[in-house]
Amino acid sequence: KEFRYRTDSRGNVIRHVTVDVISPIAVPGRTFYTVRIPYHADFERFYAEARAIVTDIPQDGDPYGAEKVLQAQGDYDVFLLSATPDLYFTSLTYAQGAPGQPTEYPLMNAGKAVMREGRLVMPLSIFVNHAFVDGAHISRFFKLVEECLKRISA
């Protein structure tokens, strides 16, 4: 639940029931296009909708459209998941928001998956607001991610 806390446009702390994913997707012939993928408790439904969204990116759309909608509504009920599939890392510091454009939601980056000692490993970095999330929460989050990845890869 700690990853669902945000500060609203009036400075009040709120907790979202669910949060969606925004993710920049590489687009051939262009750099990227950011999509918003709605939360679904059922992974199969989430995956099907995510796949449909990612494969139906408009050719003439604004690559920053999802972020602009978030800024306009002033409600950051999302987390960002970016991928760097060609980069295996042991540490990554996220680009921080510019003055007047604070980072209002968790930022995550998934790196290149590689084989290590017979196991597939994938780096994952996260940037959060420490007012809401501490080390124990992050540890619990990573444990849940590991359990989910084991379950879907079995």
Language model regions located:
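A structural signal for short, well-ordered beta-strand segments
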Residues: V21-S23, M108, L124-I126
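Charged, conformationally dynamic linker/hinge segments
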Residues: Q101, R116-L120, E146-A154
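C-terminal functional regions of eukaryotic proteins
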Residues: V13, P106, V133, I138-I152
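Anion-recognition interface
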Residues: H130
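Conserved glycine-centered short motifs in functionally critical loops
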Residues: K112-G118, M122-I126, D134-A136
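Helical lid/core segments from catalytic subdomains that handle acyl or acyl-like groups
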Residues: V27-F89
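Hydrophobic "lid/gating" helix adjacent to the active-site nucleophile
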Residues: K1-V21
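Flexible, Gly/Pro-enriched loop and linker segments at secondary-structure and domain junctions
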Residues: D77-R119
